[in-house]
Amino acid sequence: MKYSDLRDFIAQLESRELLKRIDYPVSPHLEMTLVSDKVLRSGGPALLFTNTPNYNMPVLTNLFGTVERVALGMGEESIVALREIGKLLAALKEPDPPKGFKDAFSKLPLLKQALNMAPKYVSGAECQTHVWEKDEVDLTLLPIQTCWPGDVAPLITWGLVTTRGPHQSRENMGIYRQQLLSKNKLIMRWLSHRGGALDYQAWQQEYPKERFPVAVTLGADPATILAAVTPVPDTLSEYAFAGLLRGQRTRLTRCIGNDLHVPASAEIVLEGYLEPGNEAPEGPYGDHTGYYNEVQSFPVFTVERITHRDKPIYHSTYTGRPPDEPAILGVALNEVFIPLLQKQFPEIVDFYLPPEGCSYRLAVVTIKKQYPGHAKRIMMAVWSFLRQFMYTKFVIVCDDDVDARNWQDVIWAMTTRMDPSRDTVMVENTPIDYLDFASPVSGLGSKMGMDATSKWPGETQREWGKPITMDEDVLNRVNGYWSLLGLK
C-alpha cells in the first residue's frame, strides 16, 4: 500500500476498516492504555480517539497493532512480502559483484531505486504551519499518555528523535521515550550505544560547553517511523530507506531554530537542545518486560519551540507485558531480519524471536548443520552480526527438521538432543538492556546458547538416535482410505 503521509495512511486504513474512530471521551491517563490493550489483544483495529477530555487534539494508538498493518506501513500487503524488504536490505548492506553482463543488467532496477532514495528538501512545510515559541511553549497542552498506575509522569512514547554528531553530514533517527518534566522540559531516555547517545557523546567531547541540538517528531509517516527501527545499512540514511518503502522520496524541511531536518508532513515537531551535564532521574515506568524499570539519570531535553500542522494528531502507544505494540513490530521485523542473516549465513533455515520473549531476548534458529560445532558458530553470529541482537540473552539452535516457531518441536529437540553440560554455552559480562533487572549489574550480564542439534562424530562418542518416521507407502495408503473409516 502506497501513501503520502500519516493522514493518508489513516484514511486508507479506515477505508479498509482497519482503523476505528472513538468519539466517546477516553482519558490519556490510564484509560487509553486499557482500551488500546484490549483491542490489540483481540487483533483489532488502529484507534483514533477524537474526544480527549481536557485536550483539543485527537490521539492515535495501535497504529502497528497487527502484523498486517506493519506490512502496510512498509508499503507491502502481507507479512510474506517483508522477506523481500529484507532481501533488499541484504543486497544494499553487502552487494554481490555482478557475475556477468546479464547479471549486471538485472541489478539495474535495484541501483535505480537506490539512486532515487535521496530525500527532497522543501520550505513552507506543513509541520511548521503553527509555531509556539518562548512562553507559548507548553508540553502539557499535548495529550501525553500516562500508561500505568505506577508511572511517575506522562510519557512520550513515539518520539522520533533526530540528531547529528560533530563533523557528520548524516542525521541519525531513533525512537526514545521522553518523560514530561515541565512545560518545556523532557527527559531523553536513550541507552549509551544508541545512535542519538553516541552523537551526544561525540558532541560533548568536541564542544564540552555548547548545547546539543535535537529535534523530536511526533506523528511522522509510518515508513519513516519503521525505517528508524529497521537495520538500515550504515551507508544509507533512514530517510532514504523510508522513501524506498513509501515509493517516493521523503520530504524534509529544516528546523526553524537549528540545522536539523524533520519530515515535512509531520504532525508535531519539538525543537530544542541538551545542555551538557544537565541530567535528571527518569522513571519508574512500566515497560515492555511487563515490569516497572528502575530509576536512572538521563539528559534533560529543553524544548525551545513547538511547530505543528493544522489540527494535529498526537501519535502514542503503551508498552507492557507482551503482546504489546513493540512485540507486534518485533514479529513483523523478524521477517526482515531473516534474509539479512541468511545472506551472511546461508545455512540458516529460519530465525524466530518469540513475542513472549519481550521481542528480542530469546531467539530460536534452525540450520542445515554441516560440521561439528556449527551450532556454536551460529550462536556467536546472532549475538554479533546485527546490533539489534546484542541484548538477546538466549539463543537456541536446532536442526532444520524442527519448526522454530513451534514450541512443541523446540522443546522436543532440547530435551532429546541436548546434554546440559556439553551443549550449553555461557558468556559472561556482555551488554544487556539496562531494563533487564535480572542481570547482576545494570547494562552488563550473561548470555546462554543452547545447542539442540543432533550431534556429529567429535561431539559425541555414542551412536546417535534415529528419529521415528512412518513408511511413506503406508502413510499414503492409509491417507487414501482414511475417509472410509468413519473417523474425524
Curated annotation (Swiss-Prot):
The protein, known as: 3-octaprenyl-4-hydroxybenzoate carboxy-lyase
Binding of Mn(2+), residues: 172, 238
Predominant subcellular localization, coarse grouping: membrane
Keywords: Cell membrane, Decarboxylase, Flavoprotein, FMN, Lyase, Manganese, Membrane, Metal-binding, Ubiquinone biosynthesis
GO molecular function: 3-octaprenyl-4-hydroxybenzoate carboxy-lyase activity; metal ion binding
Location of this chain's protein in the cell: Cell membrane
UniProt-annotated binding residues for prenylated FMN: 175-177, 189-191, 194-195
Gene, per the UniProt record: ubiD
GO biological process annotation, one example: ubiquinone biosynthetic process
Cofactor comment text: Binds 1 prenylated FMN per subunit.
Enzyme Commission number(s): 4.1.1.98
